[in-house]
Amino acid sequence: MIKKTVFSLAILASSAFAHSAIMNCFDNGDGTITCEGGFSDGSSASGVYFIIEQNGKEIFGTKMNENSEVTFKKPNGDFRAILDAGEGHEVYIKSKDITQ
């Protein structure tokens, strides 16, 4: 009985981490940034909320398109891009980490 319980808990714990949110952003070199999102299990981030935050305030918000992408005008100064797929499934990328 104990072995079955431990095995069941291990299966449940592994499935809880089966789909971590992932995102990559790159500078297009034309004054815009493109961010691509998804999940570690290969599922789409289409429709997932995306935010640009600057100085602790949301300056842009939208949802990932059907290709799990968002392209936006590059803000002046430091900012961070946030993929918000719900509690425990957020990804934060600082502007200094976005390269061309």
Please name every model-derived segment:
Residues K63-F72:
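Glycine-centered loop-to-beta-strand initiation motif
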Residues S46-V48, F79:
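Short beta-strand/loop motifs in extracellular/secreted proteins, especially
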